[in-house]
Curated annotation (Swiss-Prot):
Plays an important role in the de novo pathway of purine nucleotide biosynthesis. Catalyzes the first committed step in the biosynthesis of AMP from IMP. NCBIfam families: PRK01117.1 (NF002223), purA (TIGR00184). IMP binds at D13, E14, G15, K16, N38, A39, G40, H41, T128, R142, Q223, T238, R302. It comes from Brachyspira hyodysenteriae (strain ATCC 49526 / WA1). It catalyses: IMP + L-aspartate + GTP = N(6)-(1,2-dicarboxyethyl)-AMP + GDP + phosphate + 2 H(+). Its EC number is 6.3.4.4. Pathway: Purine metabolism; AMP biosynthesis via de novo pathway; AMP from IMP: step 1/2. Substrate binds at T298, V299, T300, G301, R302, A303, R304. GTP binds at residues 12-18, 40-42, 304, 330-332, 412-414. This is Adenylosuccinate synthetase.
Length: 427
């Protein structure tokens, strides 16, 4: 029996969905514990590409119980659309559970998100405008509507009326917006309620019973450590807690029940939206990586900023999450490069920094200290054993492991489920 957390170590888009999909084969439960429809992940199974935003990647395994935990904010329209899409592809959804404690994302959250981002002007955060921040704001302000509230017509109507009146004051007086219609929202969301009802459950009890029964559980992170509300490059972060601790608070499973934490590391670095990115590339190499890796957002379609692998970021993520090992993804994207670099330290005012700076002014001015490596100039796509990787690829991976002081357990050399090298057994 093992409970394993999969967490992103960079700014998201590391390939967590691929790793979760691969490891889910050995699990009975797969859990999503935070974030919302702002977190896209792509999984390829039998050459069929699945793009998911709310549903755990484990849903692609017909015999797994997939749980959306209390820490997730759920937009019913997106959730039901994903369900319909999977049903069309003959994916079994009968084992899907939604926490009755999860919060409901409403249309006024999306409107506020967009208006607030526009209002920030040059200080914009680069939000996906999916309403995630305003929804978590309502949750923290104790104004939110939970799934359990949506299941009770009278409770939902009362809470919705209060929220609509409050939000319309804000929308009309501050943003000169027409506001939202209570009756229309009530009718729309009560319709969603009946479609959601079969999936709603006390997932905290379900998961803790599964642990007592010695089931294997995989906690699937969304976004990543550097987007964590506390530990990321604040304020250019998300509104939830993608670090390993968030898997516990977002699912109702205590930290002492976790056996293993695996950090997913893309073999290069990418970032979407605003914020410091010390190892960012602005040359032809950066464009090559973007094009070869298809580095465009699953949710927004925005081009991702690309750069060299930043070991300072990953080492910091190892500290924050207490990583037991790392899973390297997208190594194959680097197959054609003549030279590669890893940022192993930051220099500021001619001094090497210890730790990862919280001050974004400093972070935006640091000079990356690089170590250069020879490329391997051959395809890694068909390799399934670590020892059979090109020598230069192994040197690159070994040095990363040394700098971040964390072992490698998995290497992914393609998007397919089978394009995976297991270095250290997880389950």
């Amino acid at each position: 029996m093992a409970s394993v957390i999969i967490v992103g170590t960079q700014w998201g888009d590391e390939g967590k969905g691929k790793i979760v999909d691969y490891l889910a084969e050995n699990c009975e439960y797969v859990v999503r514990s935070q974030g919302g429809s702002n977190a896209g992940h792509t999984v390829v199974v039998d050459n069929i590409k699945y793009k998911l935003r709310l549903l755990p990647s484990g849903i692609l395994h017909k015999d797994k119980v997939c749980v959306i935990g209390n820490g997730v904010v759920i937009e019913p329209k997106v959730f039901l659309s994903e369900i319909d899409s999977l049903i069309e592809k003959k994916v079994n959804i009968s084992n899907l559970k939604i926490s009755d404690r999860a919060h409901v994302l409403m249309p006024y959250h999306k409107i506020l998100d967009e208006l607030q981002e526009e209002d920030l002007g040059e200080n914009k955060l680069g939000t996906t405008k999916n309403g995630i921040g305003p929804c978590y704001m309502d949750k923290s302000s104790r104004l939110g509507i939970r799934i359990v509230d949506l299941m009770n017509k009278e409770t939902f109507a009362k809470k919705l009326k209060f929220n609509v009146e409050l939000k319309n004051k804000l929308l009309k007086k501050l943003y000169n917006h027409d506001g939202v219609n209570y009756d229309e929202l009530l009718k729309e969301y009560l319709g969603y309620a009946e479609k959601l009802r079969p999936f709603v459950a006390d997932t905290t009890t379900i998961l803790n019973k599964a642990i007592k029964e010695k089931k294997n559980i995989l906690f699937e992170g969304a976004q990543a450590t550097m987007l964590d509300l506390d530990h990321g490059t604040y304020p250019f972060v998300t509104s939830s807690y993608p670090a390993a601790g968030g898997a516990c608070t977002g699912s109702g499973v205590g930290p002492r029940k976790i056996d293993n934490v695996i950090g997913v590391v893309k073999a290069y670095a990418t970032r979407v939206g605003e914020g410091p990115f010390p190892s960012e590339l602005f040359d032809d190499v950066g464009q090559f990586i973007r094009d070869k890796g298809g580095e465009y957002g699953t949710v927004t379609g925005r081009a991702r900023r690309c750069g060299w692998l930043d070991a300072c970021v990953v080492k910091y993520a190892s500290y924050v999450n207490g990583l037991d090992s790392i899973a390297i993804t997208r190594l194959d994207i680097l197959d054609e490069l003549d030279k590669l670099k890893i940022c192993v330290a930051y220099k500021y005012n001619s001094e090497i920094l210890e730790g990862y700076p919280a001050d974004l002014d400093i972070l935006s001015k640091v000079e990356p200290v690089y170590e250069e490596f020879e490329g391997w100039k051959t395809s890694t796509r068909d390799i399934r054993e670590y020892d059979k990787l090109p020598e230069n690829a192994k040197k690159y991976l070994k040095r990363l492991s040394e700098v971040i002081e964390t072992d490698i357990s998995i290497v992914s050399v393609g998007a397919g489920r089978d394009e995976t090298i297991i270095v250290k057994k997880i389950f």
